[in-house]
């Protein structure tokens, strides 16, 4: 087996691992309540796999430039890697949309909770005002 074949096999393995991690990410983002620590672990694992894939891609280019002989087996492996990469790009985009939806729902929940954060009191003028905790209002 040539060095290029080994690199392509390693890339395939990393892409399969990345698919598993991205499926887990999608599952986390699809549930009603996200486990933050679990999502962070998944994100770190995904980043590590992407860094490994980037390194392998650099090695593949160096090796391929050195060989420059077209080989059917190599071409088939590269085609499979290209297809997996395109699928993972689409999956990552979908996960990004799910994450944006979660962020939007969290923002809406915060907006609902915000008015209830501090009690409303009546001021000397009879109008409602929000109390300021931890100090007096000073005007100069």
UniProtKB/Swiss-Prot annotation:
Matching entries from SUPFAM superfamilies are given as: FlgN-like
| Localization per Swiss-Prot or TrEMBL | Cytoplasm
State any GO CC term. cytoplasm
Region named Disordered = 119-140
Family of the protein in this entry: Belongs to the FlgN family.
The name this protein goes by in its record: Flagella synthesis protein FlgN
Q: In which broad location class does this protein mainly occur, judging by the first location in its UniProt entry?
A: cytoplasm
Q: What does this protein do?
A: Required for the efficient initiation of filament assembly.
Gene Ontology annotations of biological process type: bacterial-type flagellum assembly
Gene3D superfamilies reported in the protein's UniProt record? FlgN-like
**Origin species:** Salmonella typhimurium (strain LT2 / SGSC1412 / ATCC 700720)
Q: Do you know which InterPro entries this protein is assigned to?
A: FlgN-like, FlgN-like_sf
Q: What's one Pfam family here?
A: FlgN
**Does the keyword section mention DNA repair?**
no
Record key words, sorted: Bacterial flagellum biogenesis, Cytoplasm
């Amino acid at each position: 087996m040539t060095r290029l074949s080994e690199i392509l096999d390693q890339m395939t393995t990393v892409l399969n691992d990345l698919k598993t991690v991205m499926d887990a990410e999608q599952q986390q983002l699809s549930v009603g309540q996200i486990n933050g620590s679990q999502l962070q672990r998944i994100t770190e694992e995904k980043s590590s796999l992407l860094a490994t894939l980037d390194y392998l891609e650099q090695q593949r280019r160096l090796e391929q430039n050195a060989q420059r002989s077209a080989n059917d087996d190599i071409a088939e492996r590269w085609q499979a890697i290209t297809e997996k990469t395109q699928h993972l790009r689409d999956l990552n985009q979908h996960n990004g949309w799910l994450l944006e939806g979660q962020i939007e729902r969290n923002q809406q929940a915060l907006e609902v909770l915000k008015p209830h954060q501090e009690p409303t009191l009546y001021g000397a003028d009879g109008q409602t005002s929000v109390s300021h905790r931890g100090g007096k209002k000073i005007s100069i």
